[in-house]
Amino acid sequence: MFTAKNPFEDIVLKATSDELTSENWELNLEVCDKVSSGGDTAARNCIAAIQKRLVHRNANVQLYALTLADAVAKNCGLAAHQEIASRSFTQTLARICLDRNTHSTVKKRCSALVKEWAGEFDDQSLGLMKETYESLKSQDAVAEDETPAEPPREPTSEQLRAEDEELRRALELSIQDQGGRNAWPSYNTEQAETSGSSAPAAASSSSSAYQPTSQSLAPAQQQQQQQHDANHTNGTSSSAHAQPLSAATPPAVASRVRALYDFSPTEPGELAFSRGEVIRVLDSVYEHWWRGEVRGEAGIFPVNYVEVLPDPTPDELQREAQMEARIFSQAADIDRLLSKLRSLDPARDNLADDDELQELYQKSLAMRPKIVKLIDRYSNKITELKAMNDKFVHARGSFDEMMEQSLSRYNPGGHSSQDYLRPRPELQQHFSASSADYAQHPSYPTAHAYSVQQAQSASSAHDQIQYPFNPEQRHGYAQSAGAEPADPSYVQGSRLPSGPQPPQQITMAHQQQPHEQQYSSAPHDDEKRRLFERARAESEAFQQQHFQSQAHTSRSGYSGAYPSQPDASVLNQQMGNMNIGGSSSYASHPTGH
């Protein structure tokens, strides 16, 4: 009623386990020993256990079972051959070879063993194996014979001797040609610096310089060297032709990759990511490490942890946009489903019979994966935008701090940095137009007027010395009454007689250098421009009023001496009332002659 357990089942199970990485020949030989010592019954039990493993779904288990059957066939004699050639076992082999779900490697191995066993089993009682082979062959289930590759021929002694001779010559040439052919010109140059008179002859031609020791070589070696030179020249030219082609087609660098595994950084500067995240590639630093960014963090990551994502084509982008529009257009179906569910009562209404409800539910259910995909996409965009905003805030804070430090160092007491940090759309949108308008502003001299002013200043140098304006006074340093001018030419020129000077030229001479400084440092924003124009207008009005009255006094009482200078204290008081720049450029005490 109950059948006894097969004694070979456990050992065959171990020998064909799916946990093995290769054939366990120790167990295979142990099975063969048990079959040889057990007789016909042992052979029958062993082949039955192997037959169970042949129908396993794991391809590795099937391969291990076929290997074990082949070992039993080769080591256990006629009793094992009869069991292998039985109808039950041969039908199992044929089923493996003809099954479409069987792995191709298992099919090839099984058909090869059937062919091998059909040729080895020459006993009349084993004819079923030959019939199985013929049947499989008629159904094209047996792999065709592959012509074995010819084994490499053993080199003869003459070939070995010739190779040794060529190697010896190559070594001699390499010793003589140290640094390669391209190193000989530099070698000759170094010898030219040290040897003196022998250098010109050595450097007269590169061909003669390349063969300094060719005369000492044997004729065969000279011929070998010439062939080596020709081959090197051809190789250089071919590589030169091939170089533009390789440079024209640089390897493409991926722009996006997807993480295949979780990566936890072990060193500072590495990028951490989780499986499935899309990483934006910033640079391919090394062959196996790239630099990327994800969730606002940047760092390097191993290439074998990710897979390259191709850039989306215009068609794909269009399809995604259409799918997104379709999802938003179908959002009304979800609202209809919710409103309909609120109006139904499961206690009194049969929901299964409501076709409209079922249709709305199926439509909403089909939208679910698309909505999740859109959520993931927009979540990534939100993360990137937040990271971009954080970077901008950091950059803006750094810029504000550096601008404050720069203004406090190079422009103390000037305007605040807020004047520079205020956004100016007119400069961003109409930069070229505002620049042209600023250049043509009537309150600033044009290039032509400025050159005319320079020419007038140079031509009226003799008239300008009538008014003894000391440049040091312009910078706030008064000259003492008894001090002599340091420049002799200035003393000589100041004593030359001259006629009275017009007030316009006096004003121009007095303002020449300050105006140049003001023009060279013209402001570039509206507020500073208005302040500049106001200060300039007030300064011109004051100077015209003062110097006209002073010139009138000097013309009425002219006696050939210097005209009287204006009182510096009065000028400082008047300039302080106007509050131009917060300080005066005149001396704090009167000067004398």
Swiss-Prot record:
Keywords of this entry: Endosome, Membrane, Protein transport, SH3 domain, Transport
Stored InterPro entries: ENTH_VHS, GAT_dom, SH3-like_dom_sf, SH3_domain, STAM, VHS_dom
Annotated compartments: Endosome membrane
Region (Disordered): 136-251, 474-593
Domain of life according to the entry: Eukaryota
Compositionally skewed regions (Low complexity) per UniProt: 194-227, 540-552
Listed Polar residues bias regions: 175-193, 232-241, 504-521, 566-593
Residue ranges occupied by any UIM domain in the UniProt entry: 162-181
SUPFAM superfamilies to which the protein is assigned, alphabetical: ENTH/VHS domain, GAT-like domain, SH3-domain
Similarity comment text for this entry: Belongs to the STAM family.
Protein name, as recorded: Class E vacuolar protein-sorting machinery protein HSE1
